[in-house]
Amino acid sequence: MEKFQGYLEFDGARQQSFLYPLFFREYIYVLSYDHGLNRLNRNRSIFLENADYDKKYSSLIVKRLILRMYEQNRLIIPTKDLNTNLGHTNLFYYQMISVLFAVIVEIPFSLRLGSSFEGKNLKKSYNLQSIHSIFPFLEDKFSHFNYVLDVLIPYPIHLEILVQTLRYRVKDASSLHFFRFCLYEYCNWKNFDSKKKSILNPRFFLFLYNSHVCEYESIFFFLRKQSSHLRSTSYEVFFERILFYGKIQHFLKVFVNNFPAILGLLKDPFLHYVRYHGKYILATKDTPLMMNKWKYYFVNLWQCYFSVWFQSQKININQLSKDNFEFLGYFSSLRLNSLVVRSQMLENSFLIDNVRRKLDSNIQISSIIGSLAKDKFCNVLGHPISKATWMDSSDSDILNRFVRICRNISHYYSGSAKKKNLYRIKYILRLCCVKTLARKHKSTVRAFLKRLGSGLLEEFLTGEDQVLSLIFPRSDYASKRLYRVRVWYLDILYLNDLVNHE
């Protein structure tokens, strides 16, 4: 129990003094020489992956802004002279300093992440960074599970909750006060001029979100790590205890005293957790009763410990054999494949019916058509229309845009078990391209295709389509069979909008 209590009472050695580089502002020149402080761990910070933030700020500018704020005498400025221009100048101050604050705070998190992998002999693999790398794992593991919890991660509405989340990691009170001051001032000016979206600071709020989720996952993973097997002692179930609804300031004491009861509830050897796009899924081989207990555990954890109002309706319990669950643009479900095997022993023969469970991932075509309709590629029914906003571009530019979008969609949804919906999306983009070019040249679609021939549509063939056409030019059965094979690419690091693929 002492080691559990030592873990729950956050170690003071992990707390950091973040604001000292700002106070001793002469040392802030170190930031300008290090280019984002990402070389300390020989790896890029986890908060900077696939983000082009290095070009959007300058530490030297922040240095000068801090000097100006120190030299400025705010007492001699009357209130009536605070016009809009001065307000935007102050907003620029807060924005730049908040960026630098996020850079400084990221350092211990990055170092802590690097130290956690030391001694584990993990090889660097860029394939594990791909979004598609999770799907082979799901196909291998989820076929043995029964239920999946689909949960939307709540985010605190009040700013003070975000400040309190970082209080365990911050040693000096000045850092906490400075963080609170910048956060409130920045949000006030953002609400004052909400039309200018370009002034938003994604790096600062990305750090807040990651720190919020990291705090939640540290508790959840600790409980999961200590679990091994479910015990059947009903009186130790934690959710039925009145002490759980005690005051928040006494939560740690209640948590430690009832620790065996919590582990008695959560002990499950088959449990997998995946977080993505502000959501997470929890797959397990359990009973409906246990899934409901997991559901209310998350609700009570968010409400009592993180002071975030969280409704149980935001947690969906999906039975894999009956329901579909949405995951990264796919609809996934378990399919039962019957395999009949004939076994013969001497003069007797037997028919053995084996049922295999296989995870199928299909395209959610309604959402893709909705995205295409929103960007004026088709109407809400999926009928292609001409792209009027691209009329001023050259023919080659228009064709390249459509081909790039079509190939990106085919590249991402190549793992679908049924390619019929994917072919429909390709058809919409092809016909939209032809209608756009025909409208630009003031011609009909039929006349335009007759003049250019079918070579125009061959540009939409993806790499795998061209390979299949070369390997199986005559065998229709083999070609159709290979077209049903799912392909997962390990070079997709992030998702962009369908139209803005570069």
Swiss-Prot record:
GO terms for molecular function: RNA binding. GO terms for cellular component: chloroplast. InterPro entries: Domain_X, Maturase_MatK, Maturase_MatK_N. One of its GO terms (biological process) is mRNA processing. Signal peptide: none annotated. Keywords: Chloroplast, mRNA processing, Plastid, RNA-binding, tRNA processing. It is found in: Plastid, Chloroplast. Its main location: plastid. The keyword Metal-binding does not apply. Usually encoded in the trnK tRNA gene intron. Probably assists in splicing its own and other chloroplast group II introns. Binds its homologous trnK precursor transcript. Belongs to the intron maturase 2 family. MatK subfamily. This is Maturase K. It comes from Sinapis alba. The gene is matK.
